Swiss-Prot record:
N6-(pyridoxal phosphate)lysine PTM positions: 98
InterPro entries assigned to the protein according to its UniProt record, in alphabetical order: Trp_synth_b_CS, Trp_synth_beta, Trp_synth_beta/beta-like, TrpB-like_PALP, TrpB-like_PALP_sf
Assembly: Tetramer of two alpha and two beta chains.
Function: The beta subunit is responsible for the synthesis of L-tryptophan from indole and L-serine.
Pathway this chain belongs to: Amino-acid biosynthesis; L-tryptophan biosynthesis; L-tryptophan from chorismate: step 5/5
Gene Ontology terms: cellular component: cytoplasm
Record flagged with keyword Cell inner membrane: no
Gene that encodes it: trpB
Xref: Pfam families: PALP (PF00291)
Protein name, per record: Tryptophan synthase beta chain
């Protein structure tokens, strides 16, 4: 299928939440009134200067924005091509980009009078950000997390509990992010009157993909300004990792209508694209999951396939619907990096720049290691460093110990 190239890549979604054939709102009847209320509340808040002003104040004084745009001099020298900059969203309060979105949604929940917040989480970063903002505003917080992720992301589980959240391990399915989202949706259907569902990525039923994108777009907006200050022009390329794709959409969206800017999204290729992986664009096809139509990993019978990634935050069998549309419109190039490539990038960045990245953005760095050497030295490449690696140190340490024993 070919997608017509629009006048603007930034005009979506339409009033029903569609990006071309993707998106929409496929939800239970009991949820539809809530979804429509949320859409109206968000439109009102977006048009309210007081809401925007309060959010900007918290961004500055609580989150710590703007995050720096950092020239990675040693990595640039090592790779011998493009000049590499990192957008350092791992320096935000809570350690990732997730707080950008959660701040906006929790402020919206308060505006709507909701006292109980639920969230799903994979790596735990969205859960930590949600627990943090709930603590700040005195709201009840319940976080659903796959039991496998609870085991591999223990530091974040402890952080959530210390912040006062109730963490519920999900034992169904593959016990990872998809299953956590299923349980959160079940909770929401049961508790519609007092509960706000804070979705962590650019997925779910409309208006969530649009809303999360808007809250995350501060990343790309700052990058435009900072790159003009640093280099006097726009970057030549952008690179970001993709699970659901909120950090990537936050960086990409403000640049979509700049044809001179190449854009690369990096999915998780896991053990390889012919084996277990989480690369929905590379290995999936359109279907419906969690309230929206998008590219999904499916078996021959159309059932959702199990995803795999070394990174809990990319371990999801789908991708945000706007990414699916940008893929078909050929505005963004979607690549993938394996577990081993991400691990090598994790170690390289730690040792060259003194920055321990999360395993999620390590996938983006892995592709930079392949892309940058083939670019001229005046090519400006911006990479979204969307999370810090504290949560992954125990897991990576265990992998390295096993490697050492085998060698």
């Amino acid at each position: 299928m070919t997608t017509a190239i629009p006048n603007s890549y930034r005009s979506g979604p339409d009033e029903r939440g569609h990006f071309g054939i993707f998106g929409g709102r496929f939800v239970a009847e009991t949820l539809m009134p809530l979804i429509l209320d949320l859409e109206k509340a968000y439109a009102d808040a977006k048009a309210d200067p007081a809401f925007q002003g309060e959010m900007n104040s918290y961004r500055t004084h609580y989150v710590g924005r703007p995050s720096p745009l950092y020239y990675a001099e040693r990595l640039t020298e090592h790779l011998g091509g493009a000049k590499i900059y990192f957008k350092r969203d791992e320096l935000n309060h809570t350690g990732s980009h997730k707080v950008n979105n959660v701040l906006g949604q929790i402020m919206l929940a308060r505006r709507m009078g909701k006292k109980r917040i639920i969230a799903e989480t994979g790596a735990g970063q969205h859960g930590v950000a949600t627990a943090t903002l709930c603590a700040r505003f005195g709201l009840d917080c319940v976080v659903y997390m796959g039991a496998v992720d609870v085991e591999r992301q223990q530091p974040n589980v402890l952080r959530m509990e210390m912040l006062g959240a109730k963490v519920i391990p999900v034992q169904s399915g593959a016990r990872t992010l998809k299953d956590a989202m299923n349980e959160a949706l079940r909770d929401w259907v049961t508790n519609v009157h007092n509960t706000f569902y804070c979705i962590g990525t650019v997925a779910g039923p409309h208006p969530y993909p649009m809303m999360v994108r808007d809250f995350q777009s501060v990343i790309g907006q700052e990058t435009r300004t900072q790159m003009q200050e640093a280099e006097g022009r726009l970057p030549d390329s952008l690179v970001a990792c993709i699970g659901g794709g909120s950090n990537a959409m936050g960086l990409f969206h403000p640049f979509l209508d700049d044809p001179s800017v190449e854009i690369f999204g990096v999915e998780a290729a896991g053990h390889g694209l012919t084996q277990l992986h989480a690369a929905s664009i590379a290995g999936g096809r359109p279907g419906v999951l969690h309230g929206n139509r998008t590219y999904l990993l499916m078996d021959d019978d159309g059932q959702i396939a199990e995803a795999h990634s070394i990174s809990a935050g990319l371990d999801y069998p789908g991708i945000g619907p706007e990414h699916s549309w940008l893929h078909e419109a050929k505005r963004v190039t979607y690549l993938s990096a394996t577990d081993d490539e991400a691990l090598d990038a994790f170690l390289l960045l730690s040792r060259l720049e003194g920055i321990i990245p999360a395993l999620e953005p390590a996938h983006a760095v892995a592709k930079v290691m392949q892309l940058a050497p083939n670019k001229p030295k005046d090519h400006l490449m911006v990479v979204n460093l969307c999370g810090r690696g504290d949560k992954d140190v125990p897991q990576v340490g265990e992998i390295l110990r096993k490697r050492a024993k085998q060698s």
